[in-house]
From Swiss-Prot:
An outer membrane protein that may participate in pathogenesis. Some human Lyme disease patients have antibodies against this protein. The Mlp proteins probably undergo intragenic recombination, generating new alleles. The gene is mlpC. GO terms for cellular component: cell outer membrane. Keywords: Cell outer membrane, Lipoprotein, Membrane, Palmitate, Plasmid, Signal. The keyword Lipoprotein applies. Residues 1-17 form the signal peptide. Disulfide bonds: none annotated. Induction: Induced when grown at 35 degrees Celsius. The lineage of its organism: Bacteria, Pseudomonadati, Spirochaetota, Spirochaetia, Spirochaetales. Residues 39-61 have a biased composition (Basic and acidic residues). It comes from Borreliella burgdorferi (strain ATCC 35210 / DSM 4680 / CIP 102532 / B31) (Borrelia burgdorferi). It is a lipid-anchor. This is Lipoprotein MlpC.
Length: 148
């Protein structure tokens, strides 16, 4: 009987020891998971902190129409650094130029609208080779109202 009592006590001690280790293990696993999560967040933050290009920064400030006309303008400014030079201008001047482009393109309608828009794109391309954005509204004008 003494042997059975001793074995029973040893069994209870072992069982109690296993439970305490399991609780510690669970706590450690939870802490490691939290650390891993923090580490993952810091890695995600570093990948998201890439500097935005001038174009991306500008797009955040533009309306949908202005974004559309910026997309229209980009292939027109194909020369070396022309589009980047355009982006260096003041945001208000860029918005004004994009609104002017919208006005000019909206005035192109009728049978020859596509040809007139293509001609206007050429005018814009030539203007930005030599012109200053301050004179854009007067220097880059479509012929849509004249012949349309």
């Amino acid at each position: 009987m003494k042997i059975i009592n001793i074995l029973f006590c040893l069994f209870l001690l072992m069982l109690n020891g296993c439970n305490s280790n399991d609780n510690d293990t669970l706590k450690n696993n939870a802490q490691q998971t939290k650390r891993r999560g923090k580490r993952d967040l810091t890695q995600k933050e570093t990948t998201q902190e890439k500097p935005k290009s001038k174009e991306e920064l500008l797009r955040e400030k533009l309306s949908d129409d202005q974004k559309t006309h910026l997309d229209w303008l980009k292939p027109a400014l194909t020369g070396a650094g022309e589009f980047d030079k355009f982006l260096e201008n003041d945001d208000d001047k860029i918005k004004s130029a994009l609104d002017h482009i919208k006005t000019q393109l909206d005035s192109c309608n009728g049978d020859q609208a596509e040809q007139q828009k293509t001609t206007f794109k050429t005018v814009v391309t030539e203007f930005f080779k030599n012109g200053d954005i301050d004179n854009f509204a007067t220097g880059a004008v479509s012929n849509c109202n004249n012949g349309g």
